[in-house]
């Protein structure tokens, strides 16, 4: 597995590459996620397909990954609703660069943890560029999300969903709806998607790199 760093349109990108990758994973990451990338890649060593993973920098998590504006759920930082700008970067800059490196026929899948998982689901309602979505503990509690996704279908055919089995016990009443929301999201996808819902032991803030690795590896096995 080779690792390299480069900058694209003002964003740092970390690229991991197997020999002759057949699938390419895209993952938005903040500083904490970046520190865990090596461990995530190690947890993916038994993936069904040789792969590449491009992790791209997100500096303002709540602003850049939220599909529309929403008030703060915890703390004082609101959601800025700039996901469309982030998706523009992916479609207009990152994918063309990666096609140049790996060829036009490589399969792209998008995924991430928490709000990045929600971004991945949302992005797949806006474009058919992705073969799969790996949404590990996605923030499907986000205000307005369930109404939106009932009217806007995920275009990727393979979707992985997961949640920690203690996440729906959150003290925050909005975040505590995540269990009901993930079950409803799963039910919506069952009719015409290859989809799974995995329950992980524990709360939201643990094993994010292992959970994300499992999400990507399930996608690799499903789209292969």
Question: What spans do the regions from the language model cover?
Answer:
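A short, hydrophobic beta-strand element of the alpha/beta-hydrolase
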Residues: 134-136
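N-terminal cap/lid segment of alpha/beta-hydrolase-fold proteins
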Residues: 1-17
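Conserved hydrolase catalytic core segment
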Residues: 122-132
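Serine-hydrolase catalytic machinery in alpha/beta-hydrolase-like enzymes
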Residues: 12-14, 19-101
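The feature captures the conserved acid-bearing segment of alpha/beta-hydrolase catalytic domains
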Residues: 140-219
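Gly/Ala-rich beta-loop-alpha elbow adjacent to hydrolase catalytic centers
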Residues: 111-116, 120
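A conserved amphipathic alpha-helix that caps or lines the catalytic cleft of carbohydrate-
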Residues: 41-44, 123-124, 186
